């Protein structure tokens, strides 16, 4: 089993962000994950699994964390595509798209100015337990909690601009 759980984010106006940090975030969240998936395939066999850590940010464009959201959308899309490609070999691919998780990520990201509203914090153990349940069921996406499921449904129904307006209003950004 391969678990790609590393991730980082840069929060704040894109134009004001440190370019090296933006590129490092995109590199870790997207390219490093891609490399790990590819490098592990020769060692995978029927019954193997790949679990990629996405985010609830994967479902929509997220102003003031543009690169993070875009990189997590990439992870979701790649996971779904690989899942389809690797199914004939008996290799299962799942993307975990949790809400907010209490980890060191929050201290490193320095996001307090741009993330003010969080409907629920989840513990890493909760996310892992849900992911393992969903992996047993061979789900392609693991979503923990009602708030995230509700968000995913709404994002699919509402126009993109409306979704971004709601996000910015919740965070008190615009």
Question: Locations of the language-model features?
Answer:
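Conserved NAD(P)H cofactor-binding loop of Rossmann-fold oxidoreductase domains
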Residues: 5-10
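Substrate-binding pocket helix/loop in short-chain dehydrogenase/reductase
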Residues: 13-14, 18-24
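Active-site helix of classical SDR
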Residues: 37, 71
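Active-site-adjacent segment of SDR/Rossmann-fold oxidoreductases
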Residues: 43-44, 60, 81-92
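Residue(s) in the substrate-gating loop at a strand-loop-helix junction
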Residues: 55
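C-terminal helical subdomain
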Residues: 95, 115-152
